[in-house]
Design a protein with these regions (language model features):
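N-terminal, active-site-proximal structural segment of metallo-dependent hydrolase catalytic domains
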Residues: 1-49, 56, 60-68, 261, ...
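Active-site beta-strand/loop signature of hydrolases that rely on acidic residues for catalysis
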Residues: 3-9, 20-43, 95, 107-108, ...
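Short, flexible loop segments at the rims of nucleotide/cofactor-binding pockets, characterized by
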Residues: 8-13, 34, 83-84, 121-126, ...
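Soluble or luminal CAZymes and related metallo-dependent hydrolases
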Residues: 12-19, 87-89, 124-132, 221-225, ...
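Structured beta-strand-rich core segments of catalytic domains in phosphoester-bond hydrolases
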Residues: 16, 31, 35-115, 122, ...
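A shared catalytic/ligand-binding motif for oxyanion handling
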Residues: 31, 36, 93-113, 118-119, ...
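Metal-dependent phosphoester-hydrolase catalytic domains
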Residues: 81-83, 139-140, 153-324
Length: 324
């Protein structure tokens, strides 16, 4: 069995190495995809603690130099970094891994644009990124491969708890005003709410604490949220691992401190999806809650031959969804 974990570690994770390592190690992954892996020293430290090799999509130049990284217990065969700054907002990392049984598995790690403040314009940008990603991955058709990372998008049919997101954004704005340096990189109201709706700011506290208004906000959020980028991947034949194994579980991954939506995914090629044994979200590990480590929760997918007893629960790990 090969266990894969995808995790946005929030602006490099410099002050949270212990927490991140505890969360990751609790899942006992063979391959780890890290998003916002901006600091090579942090990636190296986590890799050393986990006994893994690592590859990065680029070098460190500044705190917001968004990078992806891959950690692996398994042999790394080759690595490619795809840079298309005219389309892709962050480098696209491709790593070929040799699984324990000798099979080759190509892993792609992405971090799509957020641009939530642009509303449907943001989803249009993500769709252009997905088009570029599909072109890159076309060479792997017919071979096992997967795409994972932070897609900053809600899947068709998924819930969005806009009221939970609003309460989180209000809280983070307040914390940022008190201590800007400590909360750099966390989402805030301006990064999510379109400018044309900024006139609502004086009323947000009232909305966030009114049950009727929250219910209306959740309904509106689910109806008007753009879902085109995830729909494109599904139409291209890629399998949403978590949703395949958990048809009814929301599987929220973000924000970890006030779960509102599922924006982190592991997509498998059809041939690889035939080996999918389980997929789940890690909410706690080794006594560390998810929101202590990052503003995202990690997602796991397990691939094997589905032999009875192989895919049982891992000790020290708390998840959402059944470990099927």
């Amino acid at each position: 069995m090969t266990r894969i974990l995808s995790y946005n570690i929030l602006v490099g994770g410099k002050r949270r190495v212990d927490q991140l390592t505890n969360i990751i190690s609790s899942a006992q992954p063979d391959i780890v995809g890290l998003v916002e892996a901006n600091n090579p020293r942090v990636v190296e430290e986590i890799a050393q603690r986990l006994g893994m090799q690592y590859r990065m999509s680029g070098s460190y130049t500044q705190a917001y130099n968004w990078q992806n990284a891959l950690l692996s217990r398994l042999p790394i065969i080759e690595t490619h970094v795809h840079n298309h700054p005219d389309i892709l907002t962050k480098p696209f990392l491709e790593v070929c891994i040799e699984e324990a049984d000798g099979r080759k598995l190509t892993v792609f790690i992405t971090h799509l644009a957020s641009a939530f403040y642009r509303s449907r314009g943001g989803d249009g940008q993500r769709q252009r990124e997905v088009q570029a990603i599909l072109r890159i991955m076309a060479s792997k058709r017919g071979t096992p491969h997967l795409l994972m990372g932070d897609f900053n998008a809600i899947a068709p049919g998924d819930q969005l708890k806009a009221s939970a997101l609003l309460r989180y954004l209000i809280k983070m704005d307040q914390l940022y005003r008190r201590n800007p340096h400590q909360h750099l990189g966390y989402p805030n109201l301006d990064s999510v709410i379109p400018e044309r709706l900024h006139f609502l700011y004086p009323f947000l506290e009232t909305i966030a604490h009114n049950k009727v208004l929250c219910a209306l906000l959740d309904k509106a959020g689910s109806v008007y949220t753009s879902r085109g980028s995830i729909s494109m991947l599904r139409k291209a034949g890629y399998i949403d691992c978590f949703r395949l194994k958990n048809p009814k579980d929301p599987g929220f991954t973000c924000p970890a401190g006030s779960l509102a939506g599922r924006i982190d995914y592991i997509f498998a090629s059809p041939d690889l999806a035939e080996r999918l044994a389980a997929s789940y979200v890690v909410t706690e590990g080794n006594g560390i809650s998810g929101d202590e480590a990052s503003d995202h929760l990690p997602i796991v997918a397990e691939f094997g031959e589905c032999i009875e007893g192989v895919n049982g629960p891992v000790h020290g790990l708390t998840t959402t969804g059944p470990l099927t």
